[in-house]
């Protein structure tokens, strides 16, 4: 059994991870931690997340001795802020732990990226170079080999799973940039209370126009420019992305369908719906990404639906763990 620890366990993604670890036949939950100054420190996780009552009755402890935690852990999940993961990941890695980081701290190679888009100077370029990008369906070999897996972001997962099959098959005319409009539930902003996310104030609206951090992540890993506009939805969880692309001259509907089928053959977390339009309610509380599409002339619209807390975060992290250790990919996810 792999002794597994979750740092940042009080948040939504941390709670989802705790439940998966508890269900996993090859893992044992070694500890749940939050920052030393967190108001949640010392509380039982079932007190913070009622759905865990009677399932996990373990306190969320303040992280005061990271080295001690490392010595008692085989696997570390970091469900922490970018700067926190940046500081903690190297410590756990140096102690021999396998690390799955759900923040953006190690997703893109290149120190300048973090100064420009995250507002801090990256101090661990050696781990940036070694990190595997955790887009599970597209990076299995690197995930198997790497001690550090930087789990892909929620919007970037929804977008890339929809676009990559067509790019790899050279069916897209990238002179016309793919346009991604994606809407996320408010859980994507975390548990911390704010006016924007309060019940009476939350409203469907775009945000982060031209400057959302996931835009350069998408561009970097796709290898082509995109226009990305995220939206805040007035619902709890899920992401629906609608992506418009121009196809190369002469591309047929059959070629499009073949590209998706070939890309996701034996990839059980991606469900191809063809011309059936995906819905958030069909993927909510599941580890799946549903993809549907329509072709008209030289244009294609692809719709991608995921649960932002699961395929966009926790279940993808666990999927990466399953890949890394050679377990069945959906172990503990269903």
UniProtKB/Swiss-Prot annotation:
Pathway: Amino-acid biosynthesis; L-arginine biosynthesis; N(2)-acetyl-L-ornithine from L-glutamate: step 3/4. GO terms for biological process: L-arginine biosynthetic process. SMART domains: Semialdhyde_dh. One of its GO terms (molecular function) is NAD binding. Its main location: cytoplasm. Transmembrane segments: none annotated. It catalyses: N-acetyl-L-glutamate 5-semialdehyde + phosphate + NADP(+) = N-acetyl-L-glutamyl 5-phosphate + NADPH + H(+). It is found in: Cytoplasm. Keywords: Amino-acid biosynthesis, Arginine biosynthesis, Cytoplasm, NADP, Oxidoreductase. NCBIfam families: argC. Catalyzes the NADPH-dependent reduction of N-acetyl-5-glutamyl phosphate to yield N-acetyl-L-glutamate 5-semialdehyde. This is N-acetyl-gamma-glutamyl-phosphate reductase. The gene is argC.
